[in-house]
Each structure stands twice: as structure tokens, then as C-alpha cells.
From Swiss-Prot:
GO terms for biological process: posterior lateral line neuromast hair cell development. This is Transmembrane protein 132E. The gene is Tmem132e. Glycans are attached at N70, N91, N320, N401. One of its GO terms (cellular component) is membrane. Residues 1-23 form the signal peptide.
Amino acid sequence: MAPGMSGRRGAALLCLSVLLAHAASRSHPASPSPPGTQASPILPVSYRLSHTRLAFFLKEARPLTPAAINGSLQRSEPFVVFQTKELPVLNVSLGPFSTSQVVARELLQPSSTLDIPERLTVNWKVRAFIVRARVPASQPVAQVLFYVAGRDWDDFGVTERLPCVRLHAFRDAREVRSSCRLGGALATCLVRAELPLAWFGPPAPAAPPSARRKSPDGLEPEAAAESQQVELYYTLHAPDASGGCGSARRGPGPGPGAAARAESPTQHPLLRIGSISLFRPPPRRAVQEHRLDSNLMIRLPDRPLRPGEVLSILLYLAPNSSSAASPSVEHFTLRVKAKKGVTLLGTKSRSGQWRVTSELLTGAKHSTATVDVAWALDTPLPPWEGQGPLEILQLDFEMENFTSQSVKRRIMWHIDYRGHSALPDLERAVTELTVIQRDVQAILPLAMDTEIINTAILTGRTVAIPVKVIAIEVTGLVLDVSDLVECQSHSEDIIKVSSSCDYVFVSGKESRGSMNARVTFRYDVLSAPLEMTVWVPKLPLHIELSDARLSQVKGWRVPILPDRRSARESEDEEEEEEERRQSANRGCTLQYQHATLQVFTQFHTTSSEGTDQVVTMLGPDWLVEVTDLVSDFMRVGDPRVAHLVDSNTLAGLEPGTTPFKVVSPLTEAVLGETLLTVTEEKVSITQLQAQVVASLTLSLRPSPGSSHTILATTAAQPTLSLVKQEALLSLWLSYSDGTTAPLSLYSSRDYGLLVSSLDERVATVTQDKAFPLVVAEAEGSGDLLRAELTISESCQKTKRKSVLATTPVSLRVHFGRDEEDPTYDYPGPSQPGPGGGEDEARGAGPPGTAIPAGEVPGLGTAGPVPPTEDYLPLPTGFLQMPRGLTDLEIGMYALLGVFCLAILVFLINCIVFVLRYRHKRIPPEGQTSMDHSHHWVFLGNGQPLRVQGELSPPAGSALETVPACCHGDHHSSGSSQTSVQSQVHGRGDGSSGGSARDQTEDPASSPTSKRKRVKFTTFTTLPTEELAYDSVPAGEEEDEEEDLGWGCPDVAGTTRPTPPPDLHNYMRRIKDIA
């Protein structure tokens, strides 16, 4: 073999051996040590709720079967939504994969009594307030105010779509109905149901005396008035076509149970409001009396007055006024002074027995009147004993207008008897009048929601609920008097109220809750309480760590950073590179285990003030997660032992024990605490578990056993079903201490992750620092992937990577029957494909669209080049775009290219040799000259074939004009031919051989030619240096007529000597080799 050729073949073999050795080292990973009993990995997805105002994720306090719910391919999470204006959206994500689902109305309000088409009414409640609990027969009207609690008062778009409310009043077997429609800014309406007077009749004989109550005037009415009870219920129904609610119904009807059955199937059942009492007050005049002195008295209406109203006050002579001890009343002067706001219009006599003269004087601040009263008869005034009051005169006063809601007006009275001294000023009488703008019979405070969850204890942010106070007039008019009321909280340790009385709130300084936290509102002489339910978090908080004992991990070295948190959260590439250089200077240390943390609590309250009975929101079986609420107030007692990576992750720093606590945002008091231990013991990674996740599916359903909570279940699909579909790996680490942790718990800067495909015809891998993606190429299944976890590049001590763990990954790629993407039939990673090792790709495209081998559309037709990589045609007919290559792939492809180039050079040399062999022939017999002929020289001691005379040319021959081949003109043959001659002679007889130049130095007649006889023959040349050993003579040895000619072809025409047998055998061997 030629030296040049042997060197190139050796380089090619060296490249091939390197590739095979590298592939062998990558196909046999070290088996991890058999793990012990490890906790099962759980799909590490993250849930997030949006478009909500108040919602919590939950956890069962005593889970029954957690293993059946959560696993490596499934995870369930319960949650509850308290306040929202629109349908919430639940998002679940895993790395770059995410999916969302809108929470359906049926899950949010499974049993809502207030159903509005195409409107969300979560936490909406219809509240009812009885205006008057005791209804007199003089005003036989039952009044109930309805309003919608839990609705945002700024939501005006729904006020025109609210339903009607029907009030049902039952008295024994009789029923009265009346309806109103909810509306207005507060979504309120007042139902007034007129009750039959027969319902105020005598009571049943069985009425107990204990049922009697005292009337407001202090009198005790008969038991008959107190025993009449009327039960009140309500239902909701849609308005009619005109938007009305129908007319009221009065008369006999079925009882409550029968009435519920009488409603249409779409109506809600009867909901109880309460009961009212009916009574008949004793007949009495609604007047009040005031004694001016022992002789005179006045009477005026017993009711509030209205602006502009004329008030008539009558002056009477009281009974028993003409006694001996009393001064004479036959003639007296009455002086009246009305304060500002009251005008005295005039006076007139009510009886002809009295003569009345008056003088009126109106001033800027008050008006006065002097009235002279005298007995008009000639007879003296008889004693007035045992008789009723005697009317004397009438005084008319007018109430002036004012801006406030109510005012107090005063009228002063002074009497001067003729002939007697006046009464002292202390005995002067004063009458006080109440003048109001409206005749309000009741006030009702309304809160936007009836419950308040005190999260301010955890966050320090105030939670407030707006409040409105409305007044109800006797006529049924509803007014907003929120700006005119006063308020006070009964216990600020539970709930507080603003100074302007427009909202109630909790600030975080409260210590307990209550089912009936009370705030009292006052309007003029009226007052009414507002009762709220206040929920407070149960303390101490429950802090849950996935691992309370953290250890160092053997072999896992990470860079030493000044602030691990800032390094993890940094996203700037320049900052990341700078930190990497700094960490290289600081060195590396062993990685500590990480632990996830969650904070839970229960919101509870007391059943009523003064009792210790505890009521838990959602029941005692649920814990509410408040990790996000307290994330800003988490503290590690000793920052040298551990630190917070983020709001959900703890990491160890050095051995020790430290408390982890949640502090109050207002008082720095500890709300919850747990101990964290960082041990000196080291643990090792026993197993790297990997699961392919091709897609995520999210499903929502009601939580079993609770109508308020919703269970979200996320399932991971491990099978890739589409061409070019991407999947990621869910990776978990198992430690020797029996704990497991997701790899995503650690920063991607602290490790290296290499995912490789063992058969790239089935799947390829797109390397990513945190989430390598698997791309489906063709159908297949098995352990087709391998995941390798290494330490950070900056902590590698040698060029050989430190592998922490490696694991095979099972992958299944199966395209559905309806899938039109091409599939790939392959015999396996270690077997050649059909057709002499070339793989076969079958496309699913239409006939005539397949791309033949060696042809690429738009690039012309190439020759039959052996394939180096198989590409699957895309169903759209477009060319597949190349993916980015990693450093490992670039190196492997470079070695493969060198190997292929060496093979190509070898093939070219072979082709050139064959072509030249087939086209070269010896010259025909008698040819005088041959261009490009090779001269074979045989040097030996055998006898010459011819005598000296025969070898010498005759005189005058053409030797002088025709170049003699014996001289071997090297100028005509070329250097390459000379080189071939030298190599062939060296191999033919073992001698060093001679060149043509050496032969010309010794003429044919030289005496030295007798010592060594030279034999010449001529063959067809092969002008290839490297393949000289494959030379084949142009002549056929078997042909007797074309034997080898020795000497020059121009002089050998006369004699055809027979070649020696050894040369004949040698040339046959050369031909056989070719």
C-alpha cells in the first residue's frame, strides 16, 4: 500500500473508533443505586386563580385518600370563591406548559335562590327586614323591606334585571300576598301588604296570659290583641312581560306548605322571614295636655309637625279651678312668646262666655302676643268642679321651613291675673314642639355584605364594607339618610365603624369574631342596629414544611453567592454572567436540601356574644391556605442557618436549628411558628425520577361532601400524539433520607441537566437550561430518552462532568389513526433498516408529492449520495427547518464528516483507477512510436535474446531521427511515469532499479553492458502514483500473437522473443490483483 493512502485510511479508522467508543460510553449509563422507601412524587403544577375578589385554595384537615388523588401524572387542588364580579379563570402551569379553564356558574352557585340569566350572582343573598313587628288595627299594613346583600353597589348594569319578590302573609288558613320588584342603586324594594281587619279580631280561647305585652302608652291591652300572630314568607319570581310583578292577592288560601306546592315548578320554595303581632289599641285621642298652672291647661296634637303646618292650641279652664285657694280667673292676661321658627297667626274665642282681645307683635328673633281674657257674663264665674275642661280660646301657630331633618321649637306661656301678683318666672310654662321634614316610622342600616373576613390580621390591610342607612316614611317612601345618622360600635375589639358612618371595617387589631357583631345607627329619635358576621383567622397559624430536616447533598457542589435569593430572581444575562465570574472566584460549596412551605389556617367565629361556642367557616374539615397573604411577614429566626429562597421555598445554609415564624404586620407578635433543623449529616441522591408530560388537562367538579368548594384536577398526558409535538420532563429527586423533591425546587443555575435521545428517529431533544423539550418525530415506545443531572459548570473540577444522577426515561409516541402526519417504521436502534441499511420513510401525503432520494424541491437533483440523516417530510409539503445544534452534536457531526470525507476520497481514487484501466490499450503492431509509454527494464545476468549486432541499429537507420525508447527519454514520459517505473522495479526483482537517466549514461556498445544484460519490454501505463500496485498490462498474456515485446518497439518488429516464465507469472498476479 502506498504511504499516503495508508495514512488517510488510518485517520478514517481512528475517527470511526472514536465515534464508536463515544457511543458505547453514552449507551450504558451507570445504574443508580436501588432506592429505599421513598415518598411518591406529585405532579409539580402551579395553580392560579384570576378575576376574583376573594378566593382561597384549600386543604383537607384530615384527608382520607390523598394517594388516590395526587400522583406523578395527576394532582388535585380544592378551592372556594367568596367574592367575584365575573366568572373566575383557573390557570394551571408546569414549566412552559399551561392551560386555563373558566369556572362554570353551576359550580360557583349550585343552589342560589337569586338566579339572573347571563349574570353571576355569587354570594348574593336576599335579606328581609320587618319594618314594624307590632301592627295596630289602626294601620293594618304589614311592611317588609327586601334588599340584595353581597352585590357590588357600583354594578348598575344589573339593576334592571332583578326579579320580583312576593310577600306571603299567613294567618291560620288564610293568606295575603303582595309583590314588589327589586331595583335602584341598592337593589331594594318595600312590600306593603294590607291585612284584613278580621285578622285583628278576638284571640283564640287558648291564648296564654303570658302573651300579653304593654302598649307604647303604658296601658296593657287585652290579651286578645297580643295573641294574633301572622307568619311571613317570601318567594322570588320573574317579572311579567310589562316588567311588573302582578297585583296583590287577598283572601283565603292554602297554608304555607300548600302554597309552596301551588307555585309553578320553576319557582323557589317559600322562605321564612319571621312573624308579626297584630293588636287593637284602646280608643284614645292622639293629643297631649300641658298644665300652665292650677287653673289653666292647653291641648295640642301628639305627633311631630311638618314645615308649613298650622298648629292649633286650645286653652282650657281646668276642673276645680275656682277654689278659695286659687286666684280669680274671671279676668287674666295671657302672654305668649314663640321662638324663632314659629309664628303666631292669631287668636279667637271658643265660647261666647269669654271676651278675648289680643295684640300681636312679630320680631326678628321671636313673635309675641298679649291676650286679654275676661269673663263676659254679669254673674260671677261659678265653681268649676267635677266637670270637664272648659274651652276658652284657640291660638294658631305656623311652623316655618328649615333645612335640617328635624328641629325643636319652643313656646313660652305666662299668665297675669288682675288684682293678684304674677307668678314667679320659675313657674312659667314652656311647651316644646318637634318639627320634622319627613314622617319617618323606621330606619334600616344596610351593609353591602353581611359577612366580613378579617384578613387584616394577616396582611395589615383594612377590610371595609360600605353601609347605607335608609328611612321609611309612614306613606311607604324609602329615603337615604346615611349622611344624617350617628353610629357607634358595641365592641371595637370585633368590628369598628367609620366616623362618617359610611362603612364598617376591621383594621387587624381585633382579637375575636362574632356571629352578630353589632353597630347601632341613630337618626333623630329613631335607632336601629346593624348585625354582621365577622370571621377571624385561628391562631397560631399552621405552618407546613415538606422537610423539617435539611442536609447537605453529597457531590452536589454549587457556586457560593452573596445572596442566593437575588441570584435566583435575576433575569439579566449580564448580571448572571458577572455573578458567575464572581462565584468562580469565591469557590463552591455543597448544596443543601430545599423544602417547600405552606401556611394554613381556619377562619372561625363565636356563635353569639358571651358564649364560647366556635363556628368554623366551611366546616372543621377544611384548612385555608394563606401563604400568599403572609409572604411579606415570614421570618427565619437565625438567617445563618437557613434562608427564604422565595415565598414558598426554604434552603439550608449551615448546621443548626432555627425557628421559622410568621409575625403580625402591626404588632410584630408571632402568629405562627415551627422549627427547622439543618443537620451536619449528608444525604445522597438515590434516584432521579423522570416523567414525560406531553400536555395538561384540567377538570373542575364540586368537591365531595361540600357544595361550596370546587375540586380542580390536573392530569398529565405522557403520550405524544402529533408530529413535532413538544413534551417536557417532570423530574424528581429521591434522597437517601427518604424524602423527595421536585428538581424545579432548585435554581437552574445550581445544576446541569442533559436530556438525550437514544433514537433521534423517534424523538429529538431541544436543550434548554431549565426545561429541555422532547420533540416527536415518529412513532415508537420504550426507554428512548436519558436524563443526566450534573453539577454546575462553574463547579466542575475537571473536563469530565460530575454526574449526580442519571435515569432512562420511558417515552411513547403514538399518532392517532386519523392523524395524517407521516410515521416512521424503524427496526430499532441497533439493527439496520431495510434496503441495505437505509431507513424507509413513508409519507401520508397525496400521491405524487413524495420527494425522491437525492432530490430537494428548488435545489435540483443530486447524485446518489449515501444518506447521513433521515428527515421526515412535513404533511404541508414545506421543507423542514433545521433546529439549532448543541456543542455535542456539532462535535459528533464534525467527526462523522471527516470520516465520510475519507471514504469519499477513497472512492474517487478507485473510480479514477477503473476508468483509466478500461480506456488504456497497447499500440497496434508495427507502430513506430508511442506517446505516454512506460518502459519496464529488466536487469539480470541471463543470456541476451539478441546478439550485439542485432541490438545495434544499422547505419543510416532512423534512430537518429526517431527517439529510441531504450534511452527512456524522461522528458517525454513525465515525472510521474518515472516515479511509477522506480516503484515497480523496486517491487519486481528486489533491486533498487534504475532510472532512464542512468540507462542513457551507458551506451549499448559499452563494455559494461556485457556485465549486466538489460531486457526491455513495453506495457500500457497507469498514471496513478498511489495505485501502482494495481497495474495491469495492456496486452493479454494469453494471446500468443501479442506476446510481450522486449527492447524498443520500433526494432522489435523482426524478432518476437518469448518472455521468461517468471515475468509472465508476475504479470498474471498483477492482473488478478486488479
